[in-house]
Regions:
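Thiamine diphosphate
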Residues: 2-239
Length: 239
């Protein structure tokens, strides 16, 4: 007789109401949109927990009106990992292997080097953890070159079984979260902006699920093709 408890869970996300908040011209950083989506994820999925490596105010990962998870409070839904990116992802791996929870934890994209070994293991074990990584370009503010990610995006994309999504606006951000929360085998890195980006006219939820799509077709003769992702899509559309 099998007396084991099955902790496997299915998480999902309905973004229909969220999308109404992001009309064409809506101007905000995708890290802020991500925070709004996280609240909806938490509302729709009681087994969802969110954390960060001591960067909650910058990466926008905190579930509002929820306590911190601790030995004194197992009901807390915010995970406080400290400045330990490798330990953060390793802990997420262990909790996900146990099953029963869906985990997200964020940091700066430039610090993804610190957790590379742990996220590589997550990919090998097909653990659907979520990593919202903000400050995705040279537009990171006053911190300078030490906080400007250059090679990290390519590094994450090169890991087999790793999903890397860099949304260009709020609509794509919500769509990216839907893919991440409904993933059952792939770790997902969500690459977020610090600076504001405008919601574009032809942003597509379905297009995000395909990995890439044409957001602006040529009007007449095609002289060149501009390929962009994330915050550069706004710039490309103005070129």
């Amino acid at each position: 007789k099998n007396n084991q408890v099955n902790f496997n869970i299915q998480t999902s996300l309905n973004i229909d109401e969220l999308l109404k908040n992001y009309p064409v011209g809506h101007n905000d950083a995708t890290r802020n949109t991500s925070l709004e989506v996280i609240q909806e994820v938490a509302k729709q999925n009681p087994t969802f927990l969110s954390g960060t490596a001591d960067l909650a105010s910058s990466t926008k990962t905190k579930i509002k009106d929820e306590d911190d998870f601790s030995v004194e409070n197992y009901n807390g839904r915010n995970l406080v990992f400290g400045i330990r990116e490798f330990a953060m992802v390793a802990i997420m791996n262990g909790m996900t292997l146990h099953n029963g929870v869906k985990l997200s934890a964020g940091g700066f994209l430039v610090f993804s080097d610190y957790f590379k070994a742990a996220v590589r293991m997550a990919c090998l074990m097909k653990l659907p953890i979520i990593l919202p990584l903000s400050h995705d370009s040279i537009a990171v503010g006053e911190d300078g070159p030490t906080h400007q990610p250059i090679e990290q995006f390519a590094m994450l994309r090169s890991i087999p079984n790793m999903h890397v999504i860099r949304p260009g606006d709020a609509v794509e951000m919500a769509a990216a979260w839907k893919l991440a929360i409904e993933s059952t085998e792939n770790p997902t890195a969500l690459i977020l902006t610090r600076q504001n980006v405008e919601t574009m006219e032809n942003s597509s939820v379905e297009g995000v699920s395909k990995g890439a799509y044409v957001i602006g077709k040529e009007e007449n003769h095609l002289d060149a093709i501009i390929i962009a992702s994330g915050s550069e899509v706004n710039l490309a559309m103005k070129a």
